Amino acid sequence: VSHLHEDKKILNRVRRLKGQIHAVEAALTQPEPSCIDILQQVAAIKGAVNGLMSELIEEHLREHVIQDPEAVNEQDLQEFLKLLKRYG
């Protein structure tokens, strides 16, 4: 996992999630929060979490599972990751 502390893209995703969650919390403290607005915000959070999961899985595969990066068919790997994002 040591490679993750240097990954700015993943850290930025986490920071955006933090901001989105903070926005939901703030909306819930309003006198009459809009259920639709909150549901839209939560749906965005869900999408962001799924994106983060996909990115972490790809990093894990590339750093810890694939033993020989030269032996990997990059097109097949990308197809697998695409399926994982869609159905995972």
List PLM regions with ranges.
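Solvent-exposed interaction patches of small proteins and small membrane subunits
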Residues: 1-88
